[in-house]
Amino acid sequence: MIQVLLITICLAVFPFQGSSIVLDSGNLNEFEVVYPEKVTALPRAAVKNKYEDAMQYEFKVNGEPLLLHLERNKGLFSDDYSEIHYSPDAREISAYPSVEDHCFYHGRVENDADSTASLSACDGLKAHFKIQGEMYLIEPLEVSDTDAHAVFKYENVEKEDEPPKMCGVTQNWESYESTKKASQLNVSPDQQRFPQRFIKLAIYVDHGMYTKYAGNSERITKRVHQMINNINMMCRALNIVTSLSVLRIWSEKDLITVNASAPSSLTLFGAWRETVLLNRTSHDHAQLMTATIFNGNVIGRAPVGGMCDPKRSVAIVRDHNAILFIVAVTMTHEMGHNLGMHHDEDKCNCNTCIMSKVLSRQPSYEFSDCNENEYQTYVTDHSPQCILNDPLRPDTVSTPVSGNELLEAGEECDCGSPGNPCCDAATCKLRQGAQCAEGLCCDQCRFMKKGTVCRIARGDDMDDYCNGISAGCPRNPFHA
């Protein structure tokens, strides 16, 4: 049973205005200093792991109380996650670290339905959270013998005075008609309930980025882990689980040529993935992170509609901002291109759009209605097979067998009897109009309404509720 802790952050808050401080996220002129004090409701011996599965943080922002509900991101790593560095003679040095007791969380702010939070508790609290439409960050202060943290708005981070940074994808580059037309489709709410998909990510860090962080592989690894945690959070809106499968740091030299031409570098990386990477590692989509400054202020590039293709399921992203969340948005943006999305136009609706061509002064964290339609069209028309398997459990790769009560690769439902009104026994696919075939939140081939109780609690525990977008009964993150 998940042990839920109530952790109260008792804050001594000191606003600093006019003075300046340098944090990992950049230079700040306005921030609040807070001193967290952890108070646990359970005896220390009752907590089996170093990091709890579910937590709550209570503290104040701008003098107002805030309660943050957090749940550990169980989908952050695939079951075969590995890290590889390279020796001076280019030999691979592999490691398979234990990542079950990791320190990365997702969450929300109580009484704010539109809030989001992504947090690392590895070395103090490092997080971003959105409340009332504004993005805040919290980071530890490097003050001797204290637990001081800084809380600040994203807008208070000093911005570089430079030309706008942008994606290198053009609307007519490697695109196809079905996704161009997708933003014009009228998609009903029922059609927008996306089937769950799983993307295993392989992240490669080039030698320039390794040098940028003074050869500190541990720092780079933590930075990448936090970025994937952010990507995972943003992709939840599309019911996509993104899990890190491979992290490679080119600590000695680049294994391909990375230059100022983003198209050239991307082409070389794609060819290398096809001929080398796929023979070594299991993954669905690979991204190369680099410190190289590309021509034309480009910070990323990816083929449109390339997901699962051996050469085109790739992206390149420049590590262009000290705030790792901003870089994670760029990584999500480029992966969005691989999933059939184009850049947002004026007619697209979202608060701050992930798929905007130019990096906004305001942090982007939402897919637009156009993106949702384009993604829906892409997975329907092209059915990328590699993202069907759940990387958190061993994949089943045998030939589909009717009625074995196990969804295998390529199946949408367990075939079973030809009389099943939801599942076509000949194809193991859902019948037209069906959203599901079985599950506690499936009723007459349709997802049950969000908020419907699907598992009644026992004792002092809490009920589980349907989420309206899947047939399974998700576990309530606030179980006792």
From Swiss-Prot:
Residues in Disintegrin domain copies: 399-480
Signal peptide stretch: 1-20
Active site: 334
Highest taxon in the source lineage: Eukaryota
Keyword Ligase annotated: no
Chain positions listed as propeptide in the UniProt record: 21-190
Protein name: Zinc metalloproteinase/disintegrin
Matching PROSITE patterns: ADAM_MEPRO, DISINTEGRIN_1, DISINTEGRIN_2, ZINC_PROTEASE
Any one of the GO BP annotations: proteolysis
Family, per entry: Belongs to the venom metalloproteinase (M12B) family. P-II subfamily. P-IIa sub-subfamily.
Predominant cellular place of this UniProt entry's protein: secreted
Quaternary structure, from the entry: Monomer.
Stored Pfam families: Disintegrin (PF00200), Pep_M12B_propep (PF01562), Reprolysin (PF01421)
Domain Peptidase M12B: 197-391
Gene3D superfamilies: Collagenase (Catalytic Domain), Disintegrin domain
A Gene Ontology term for the protein's cellular component: plasma membrane
Cofactor(s) the protein needs: Zn(2+)
Disulfide bonds: 308-386, 348-370, 350-353, 413-428, 415-423, 422-445, 436-442, 441-466, 454-473
Sugar-bearing residue positions: 259, 279
Entry EC number(s): 3.4.24.-
Motif Cell attachment site per record, residues: 458-460
Tissues expressing the protein: Expressed by the venom gland.
More info: The disintegrin belongs to the medium disintegrin subfamily.
One term of GO molecular function: metalloendopeptidase activity
